[in-house]
């Protein structure tokens, strides 16, 4: 039997499994005006309470393809404190996970006056999740598979983080899944270390009457696997109708700093007649959004761009948002995450 290409998908498999057991996978939804999804220190940091509903679907042409839905809400408790909640529903084939995260943030202000943004924030988030393996449709040909049941396990973990917003500059750092967590639902030898370090930084500049630009970077490091991933982002904002509406868009490029080797050739049983190549995970995500009064809608589409990939279809994501209990924009800065 001839095979045009034989692929070893180690990198992509590692990428998917690296996210599979976390309460909330790290995708590009934070770019839809929702840094709170990643950083509990951003709870209540803005002048409005923010409700965000996100649905992400991968590979529409595949049965039981990965899908994720989140509902998040965060807002101010008082001038120096904020709180939030995130609801999560994540599915991938016969595996699913539901969870809730509760957050509290404290904000320290170093403003010279009421219009200069200089704020340091600290946040804590507690998370509860239930993982499920649905074996009700499994055939009992393997004694190690129970079949006919749903296996369930509950997990608890915490995130801690800090944010610094200074005029048009921002910096966020969070340690996710700080505690060791046993995951005996799958095997007795699953790693208990789910710790992930996330760093975001960016800067906005431009003219509010014309265009405002926001370049940013996100860096991730996974403690257990030592894998590192970086996002390079660029967003642009344009106000319409005297500020009643704002259209914005941009692009994100994600790249793994770690690679994997694969064999490309005409035979599975022999390495002869082929070559060993390597590649790194990378995909591009364009994003388009619209704010009208207190409403927000955004759409993102992620497309893998490396040679080896599971499927040619991309990942679609839609976010709906509503800003509540808004106060007048306080700070003189191009800071859409705060003003």
What are these regions (language model features)?
Residues 16-20:
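Sec/Tat signal peptide C-region and signal peptidase I cleavage site
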Residues 5-15:
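Sec-dependent N-terminal signal peptides
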Residues 1-6, 112:
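Positively charged n-region of N-terminal signal peptides that target proteins for export
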Residues 21-339:
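Subset of outer-membrane beta-barrel
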């Amino acid at each position: 039997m001839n095979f045009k290409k034989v692929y070893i998908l180690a990198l992509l498999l590692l990428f998917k499994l690296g996210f599979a057991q976390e309460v909330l996978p790290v995708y590009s939804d934070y770019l839809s005006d929702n840094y709170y999804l990643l950083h509990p220190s951003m709870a209540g940091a803005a002048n409005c309470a923010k409700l965000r509903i996100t649905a992400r679907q991968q590979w529409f042409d595949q049965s039981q393809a990965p899908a994720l839905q989140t509902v998040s809400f965060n807002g101010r408790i008082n001038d120096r404190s904020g709180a939030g909640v995130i609801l999560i529903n994540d599915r991938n084939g016969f595996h699913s996970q539901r969870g809730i995260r509760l957050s509290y943030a404290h904000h320290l202000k170093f403003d010279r006056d009421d219009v200069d943004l200089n704020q340091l924030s600290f946040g804590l988030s507690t998370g509860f999740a239930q993982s499920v393996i649905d074996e009700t449709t499994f055939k009992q040909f393997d004694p190690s598979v129970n079949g006919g049941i749903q296996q369930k396990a509950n997990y608890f973990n915490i995130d801690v983080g800090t944010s610094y917003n200074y005029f048009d500059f921002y910096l966020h750092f969070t340690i996710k899944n700080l505690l060791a967590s046993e995951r005996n639902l799958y095997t007795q030898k699953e790693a208990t270390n789910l710790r992930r370090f996330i760093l975001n930084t960016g800067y906005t500049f431009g003219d509010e009457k014309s265009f405002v630009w926001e370049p940013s970077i996100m860096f991730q490091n996974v403690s257990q696997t030592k894998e590192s991933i970086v996002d390079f982002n660029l967003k642009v904002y344009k106000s319409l109708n005297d500020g009643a509406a704002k259209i914005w868009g941009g692009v994100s490029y994600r790249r793994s700093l770690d690679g994997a080797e694969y064999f490309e050739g005409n035979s599975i049983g022999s390495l002869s007649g082929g070559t060993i190549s390597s590649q790194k995970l990378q995909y591009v995500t364009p994003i388009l959004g619209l704010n009208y009064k207190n409403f927000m809608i955004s759409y993102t589409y992620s497309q893998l761009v490396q040679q080896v990939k599971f499927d040619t279809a991309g990942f679609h994501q839609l976010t709906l948002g509503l800003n509540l209990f808004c106060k007048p924009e306080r700070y003189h800065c191009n800071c859409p995450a705060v003003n």
